[in-house]
From Swiss-Prot:
Primarily found in immune tissues. Optimum pH is 4.0. It comes from Mus musculus. InterPro entries: Amino_oxidase (IPR002937), FAD/NAD-bd_sf (IPR036188), Flavin_amine_oxidase (IPR001613), Flavin_monoamine_oxidase (IPR050281). This is L-amino-acid oxidase. It is an enzyme of class 1 (oxidoreductase). Keywords: Adaptive immunity, Cytoplasmic vesicle, Disulfide bond, FAD, Flavoprotein, Glycoprotein, Immunity, Lysosome, Oxidoreductase, Secreted, Signal. SUPFAM superfamilies: FAD-linked reductases, C-terminal domain, FAD/NAD(P)-binding domain.
């Protein structure tokens, strides 16, 4: 049995490597890949490798958002000599990188990002630079299952004869793998690129849904399209832009090779934080931003009726699109930028983990990869051998996540358990230990969605908005500001671009000088009044520069101890939940991150802090046991 397992692991590894080599060979000739290339990719790779030039004009930079885009930009700017302060509305860092760690077993589950394709060289280089170890993420295992229409087959059968699943494929489609059938439809896209050129072709693709293109342009039969939706999870993209589907497929295919971070993806944001100097303020939601002649002021909610103000030279906003819409800008954003912000289309994404007493899938010779089902769970990902028995029992996005909307955690876990048992038999019920974790990104108060996927641009200009251009002293970064959407490297690229522009003193654009003057005068309105005689609505606003921040009575202060560089909790007042303030000692660059996260633990569907100012923390999830409503 051990010899068989070893052969299966070796076969899966060779298959993944062969798929990667096939993809690399194809990508050098693939016009779609060439069309979607980043013109500045090699430059950004150099920035990750060598860093930015040391600045001769250090600026005070406030970075809003401690996801990977914000942390990467903060690291690069800090290394270049700028004074950086990071503000995060949540009670943790990482954004949509979110690793669950089961205290009982030590197993981990990725509630957010979990893989990176081999083509993402910038992200691979960043991980190596930070000393993070990578290992293979097994995307495909031929011994996994596909179950649709109550027919269940091993995936090595589906690859050769998908019609055995009950799809009435035509003669051209029979005997071809789902991936090959999808490639048949892309042949028309290749012809369009050659005939129209990259820009015109992508404009055309932006005006079609994936479903329209597959049926009308790709000339696939309806059963073949349904096969792709069920087996390749393309159904979630059917009514979205064909251009977006092309970008997604370039990074998401069973024929590509993927990596993951050994020990958990949250080691990436932790390593970034440890490598930069400056301050991090958690539980610090930004409510408004005011630009003046010579500075920009960032207003943070400290309670329901009071604010604190930070003054900086430049602000970098890396929060999600919905979070940005809750910020008041003075002067207001341009109409075009507001329209681009409202046009961002976030799709839901949900993950459900179940904890088992042992990895029963090994008995079926499954060492990783994913099974597919047309039941609500849709995709089931298996941990690699030696990675425990915490099963990603459901991964859904876009419309496929709808069956779980509104369900309680208990209902969700039981529904997913039934789906897993349909694939693997009653042993699933016997081995489940009654615990699980649910993460619905659409219900997260800070992201309010899984990732951006744009719908077709019917009757509108099909070109993507250029988020890299600053709005006065305000810059933007994040997964929504770059392509392809939905990947960690995209967020990294956006953070690098913003850091380069800020370091090069790119300049300030898009702001009407008269509006800037008006905003500056309004921001300084308080100065007309002696202390204690200010207008009531301004009473609670307090101004402080990043250099002079002091913890208020509502803050949880985290300081670096001189001896061990470990964070020591000071002034924690449980009944007054406020900011968590993390700062490094000027002489000693870097953070010790063991205690960055608050000590509160909650179920994913619970809350870490009361809903003051309309914000609920996404929390540090705890394993939920069915029937436990405490």
């Amino acid at each position: 049995m051990a010899g068989l397992a070893l052969r299966l692991v070796l076969a899966a590894t060779l298959l993944g490597l062969a798929g990667s080599l096939d993809w690399k060979a194809a990508s050098s000739l693939n016009p779609i890949e060439k069309c979607m290339e980043d013109h500045d990719y090699e430059q950004l790779l150099k920035v990750v490798t060598l860093g930015l030039n040391r600045t001769s004009k250090p600026q005070k930079v406030v970075v809003v958002g401690a996801g990977v885009a914000g942390l990467v930009a903060a690291k690069m700017l800090s290394d270049a000599g700028h004074k950086v302060t990071i503000l995060e509305a949540d009670n943790r860092i990482g954004g949509r990188i979110f690793t669950f760690r089961d205290e009982k077993t030590g197993w981990i589950g990725e509630l957010g990002a979990m893989r990176m394709p081999s083509s993402h060289r910038i992200l691979h280089k960043l991980c190596r630079t930070l000393g993070l170890n990578l290992t293979q993420f097994t995307q495909y295992d031929e011994n996994t299952w596909t179950e649709v229409h109550n027919v269940k087959l091993r995936n090595y059968v589906v690859e050769k004869m998908p019609e055995k699943l009950g799809y009435n494929l035509n003669n051209r489609e029979r005997g071809h793998s789902p991936e090959d059938i999808y490639q048949m439809a892309l042949n028309k896209a290749f012809k369009d690129l050659k005939a129209l050129g990259c820009k015109k072709a992508m404009n055309k693709f932006n005006k079609h849904t994936l479903l329209e293109y597959l049926l009308e342009e790709g000339n696939l039969s309806r059963p073949a399209v349904q096969l792709l939706g069920d087996v390749m999870s393309e159904e979630g993209f059917f009514y979205l832009s064909f251009a977006e589907a092309l970008r997604a497929h370039a990074c998401l295919s069973d024929r590509l090779r993927y990596s993951r971070i050994v020990g958990g993806w949250d080691l990436l944001p932790r390593a970034l934080l440890s490598s930069l100097s400056g301050a991090l303020l958690l539980n610090a939601p930004v409510v408004s931003i005011t630009q003046g002649r010579n500075d920009v002021r960032v207003h943070i909610a400290t309670s329901l009726h009071s604010e604190k103000t930070l003054t900086a030279d430049v602000v970098l906003l890396t929060a999600s699109g919905p979070a940005l819409q809750r910020i008041t800008f003075s002067p207001p954003l341009t109409r075009k930028r507001q329209e681009a912000l409202r046009a961002l289309h976030y799709v839901a994404a949900s993950k459900v983990f179940l904890s088992f007493r042992r990895p029963f899938w090994h008995e079926e010779h499954i060492e990783g990869g994913h099974s597919n089902t047309d039941r609500p769970s849709r995709l089931i990902f298996y941990p690699a051998r030696g990675e425990g028995s915490l099963l990603l029992a459901s991964y859904t996005w876009s419309d496929a996540a709808a069956p779980f909307a509104g369900l309680s955690t208990d209902q969700t876990l039981r529904l997913v358990l039934q789906d897993v048992a349909a694939l693997h038999g009653p042993v699933v019920f016997r081995l489940w230990d009654g615990r699980g974790v649910v993460k619905r990104w659409a219900e997260d108060p800070h992201s309010q969605g899984g990732f951006v996927v744009q719908p077709p641009l019917y009757g509108r200009e099909a070109e993507d908005y250029d988020w890299s251009a600053p709005f006065g002293r305000i810059y933007f970064a994040g997964e929504h500001t770059a392509l392809p959407h939905g990947w960690v490297e995209t967020a990294v690229k956006s953070g690098l671009r913003a850091a380069v522009r800020i370091n090069n003193n790119y300049g300030y654009g898009e702001v009407d000088p008269q509006m800037m003057e008006h905003a500056y005068a309004e921001a300084n309105y308080l100065d007309q009044y002696p202390e204690g005689e200010r207008p009531e609505e301004q009473q609670a606003r307090e101004e402080v520069s990043p250099d002079e921040q002091e913890p208020s009575h509502k803050h949880l202060l985290v300081e670096t101890s001189p001896e061990g560089q470990q964070h020591a909790f000071v002034e924690a007042i449980p009944e007054l939940q406020g900011h968590v303030f993390v700062e490094t000692v000027p002489q000693e660059k870097g953070h010790a991150h063991q205690n960055i996260y608050p000590s509160e633990h909650v179920q994913v569907h619970g809350e870490v802090i009361p809903e003051w100012h309309g914000h609920g923390g996404s929390g540090t999830p705890q394993m939920h046991r069915v029937g436990d409503h405490s």
